[in-house]
């Protein structure tokens, strides 16, 4: 039998003193837990950087080549990733090489999550390899030396996979993208399909009034600041300055949003926060001549997308010499490397489609609508969708006739065949 309207349970009375007390206790507890996470972050940093070769890879690995032992030594190394228990690789399938950016942070973000770029390659049965690097550079190493080391790594991978059906697939993120493209332009015979994610290649390109990183470079007046910083560092450039550039793009997130997100979810967020901060705070160094070469020739000089770079051996670095299919993955939400910078090299080098065909070049590009710069190669959802599609269709991409193709990757629906 329904009760009358007078049978309602009365609402509890509001006591401001009780509410204030409960709020104060909650804030105190959150503050203590937040401070403890900060303590863990500091200890984690010291433990991480004390390692001989710190990285954030989620899979076990073994060292195959030490770049310090090459004829022109560098601080890079080639790792063979050990597949997880229960996963087998197919010796017939192309091996994969994932190369992470040396742009302030340490290595491993390409294999940071089990479902990331590395995990996708392993899950598809490919033999995975990773190009890592140490926090400190070899005193004499140059950008060209790193290119030669990458070529050595690919030669070693090819030698170890004589039954593979093709040359290695190379996945290069951010800074590693332009460096791998330079290597491929000089040694095209070593490369299978190349996937570059969030990699700047045309440095003057961009949308008017957008992407403040471009404007910051112009306002600071050229490369004098990197030269000064390297001098102050006794010939080394601290990668923490590059990370600071990331932070300065969104001070509200740096100073408030990221910290408040941890504070408000401190019971559940600590693990994710600490795992990301291990990579975000693990800074590395570059030699002064390395960063000066990068700034003068690429970001200020824009000589890569105009075939204006010449090696010390007299070889012109012309991206039109690349014989492998190039997959370019970028995002409209990337304010570090917006689509004009990732794709602008194509109109810089080719007047029309006929020139692309004449150079026998295959270019596939995909533009995400919203993901940020790091999400292009860190996000689990992007790995499960875009990177999964690139990997599973890599053989089809390899046999595409020359030309420029746009890849549109959509979610499956009930009507999808």
Predicted segments — roles?
Residues 97-101, 174, 330-331:
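The conserved beta1-alpha1 loop
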